[in-house]
């Protein structure tokens, strides 16, 4: 577990959190978590959000290629996250 934490910190830490898309995805996750009264990590982990921000999927099939997203979570949250990515990309094109 400790090496995994360090690896993720190295891959996604510090500067990565400044990524605007990552911040937008985190905000959406926080909103969904509040609405569902669950911890944010139940929606998606930080590592999943980081991979999503890096890959910026534009379709359901691309979303399924993001680490940590399977059919169930894609069906439940995919539409909201794909819209957030599309909105972000349009605003920052």
Task: Describe each region flagged by the PLM.
Residues 1-93:
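Accessory DNA-binding and partner-docking regions appended to nucleic-acid-acting proteins
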């Amino acid at each position: 577990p400790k090496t995994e934490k360090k690896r993720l910190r190295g891959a996604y830490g510090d500067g990565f959190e400044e990524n605007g898309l990552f911040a937008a995805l985190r905000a959406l996750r926080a909103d969904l978590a509040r609405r569902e009264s669950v911890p944010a990590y139940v929606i998606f982990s930080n590592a999943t959000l980081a991979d999503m921000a890096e890959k910026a999927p534009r379709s359901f099939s691309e979303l399924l290629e993001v680490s940590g997203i399977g059919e169930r979570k894609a069906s439940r949250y995919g539409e909201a996250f794909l819209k957030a990515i599309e909105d972000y990309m349009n605003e920052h094109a």
